[in-house]
Amino acid sequence: MIGDAWTLRILRTVFRGRRRYSDFVSELGISRAVLTDRLGKLVANELLIRHAIEGGHPEYRLTERGLDLWPMFLAMWLWETEWGTGVMDDVPPVEQPRPMLMHTVCGHKMRPQLECQHCSVVIQPFDTQAEAGPGYLHIEPGTQSMFRRASQNTLAEASAAQAHTLMRVIGDRWNSALLAAAFKGLRLFSEFEKDLRIGPNQLSDRLGELLKLGILRARSYSGARQEYRLTRKGVAMFPIVLEMMRWGDKWLWPATAPIVLRHKPCDHLLVGHWHCGHCKMQLSRTEIHLF
């Protein structure tokens, strides 16, 4: 559900305080047909609730399940402020990352950092090890990569929704699945093909896009054969992948996560929490102010 560019853009707009149908149309440039479809799915999947306003238009408000996506959007904000939006076309002002973040408890501007709950060490991408979780043997083929298999979007929708780098990666189910697989250590075309159950033509297209976006780089290692490795820009997306996993494990398959991560420095199963980079306190959604 959250691996869709329009869905992510709508949710981010709601987090920023815009909740009405007309707000989404005017600020996102989304067609009414696509907007109606995505809002219906967000309500059906209990991420949003349609709240009637006496004498006015209804509002779409975040449910507990929707509010729990705030750490993922925090990770997205962090990536965008460090790496830019990667503008392909003009990105509307409403979607530009706000430049500063304040922790209202200590009153300081700060950069958040993701720490291990057990050892309090800042989590680094290659200090983790993926392991089969309790639900590994029961998931449908092709979902071992932590994300559900992509449905076909129309080319028009995809083009309109994916205006910049982050949405082109996270907002496309196959691209986000490839990203997650790369963090698992997969590097070869055949490994991606087997793990994701993706057709060779589609895989070639997606790898080509991730190369063009600077998320992956190709390296020849045996004649004409290539392996695909994450760039620094791609590695920096690790907190986003972690938060997508965390949300899915909590709300989609509680107690039956298909994949778990072990934090190698402390040898515990990884549980991460965001902390203030200034006072080191654990952050909560209501204690963060973007401006």
Question: Predicted regions span which residues?
Answer:
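Short, Lys/Arg-enriched N-terminal segment that forms or immediately precedes the first helix
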Residues: M1, T143-M167
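N-terminal helix-turn-helix DNA-binding core of bacterial DNA-binding proteins
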Residues: M1-S31, P97, E115, A161-Q202
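Basic, amphipathic "hinge/linker" alpha-helix immediately C-terminal to the N-terminal HTH DNA-binding motif
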Residues: G3, E54-A75, G223-V241
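N-terminal alpha-helical interaction blocks
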Residues: W6-T7, S26, D37-R38, V43-E46, ...
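Short amphipathic alpha-helical interaction segments
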Residues: I30-V43, R197-K212
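Beta-hairpin "wing" of winged helix-turn-helix
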Residues: V43-H57, R61, L213-G223
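Short, solvent-exposed amphipathic helices
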Residues: R65-G86, A236-P254, P258
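C-terminal regulatory/oligomerization modules of transcriptional regulators
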Residues: T81-T154, W253-F291
